[in-house]
Regions:
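Amphipathic interaction/junction segments at domain boundaries or subunit interfaces
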Residues: 1-82
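Short, hydrophobic/π-rich interface segment
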Residues: 55-115
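Beta-rich nucleic-acid/ligand-interaction surfaces
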Residues: 115-123
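Short beta-strand-to-coil "C-cap" segments at the C-terminal boundary of structured domains/repeats
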Residues: 124-129
């Protein structure tokens, strides 16, 4: 836990990192949706053994999220499994919450492949939502 806090603190204080990842408005920009849908479609072709395979979930007016992803195959889990350190994958998953927080996003997730879920469900909304 102590190392995780050090890593988190380092990211929060890095201005370049903030510029690269953006904020809630840039991440949830509807103009990016067509590109994300294309990425999702192409992921299902499974061109690369250890790549991600995902579905894009659009939040509706009654949902508490704006954008969602269901990952059915995870490159990080695959890499950790191949390298004999699968138990580390669940700790890498925690970084998703750090990154979401840095962008002023609310991330909700109920399961991950790293913790024996059937898929990883990411649901992003604005913290103020």
């Amino acid at each position: 836990e102590e190392c995780f806090s050090l890593y988190k603190d380092g990211l929060y204080n890095n201005k370049l990192f903030h510029m690269v990842i953006g904020n809630a408005d840039s991440y949830l920009d509807e103009k990016k949706l067509p590109g994300r849908k294309k990425w999702s479609e192409e992921s299902h072709l499974r061109r690369y053994k250890n790549d991600w395979v995902l579905d894009i979930i659009e939040g509706g007016p009654n949902d508490d999220f704006v954008l969602g992803y269901d990952y059915h195959n995870c490159g990080i889990c695959n890499l950790c499994r191949d390298e004999g350190c699968f138990e580390l994958a669940k700790y890498l998953c925690r970084m998703d919450f750090v990154l979401a927080d840095m962008m002023d996003l609310k991330l909700t997730r109920t399961q991950t492949l790293a913790e024996n879920g059937t898929y990883c469900d990411f649901r992003y909304g604005r913290k103020s939502q």
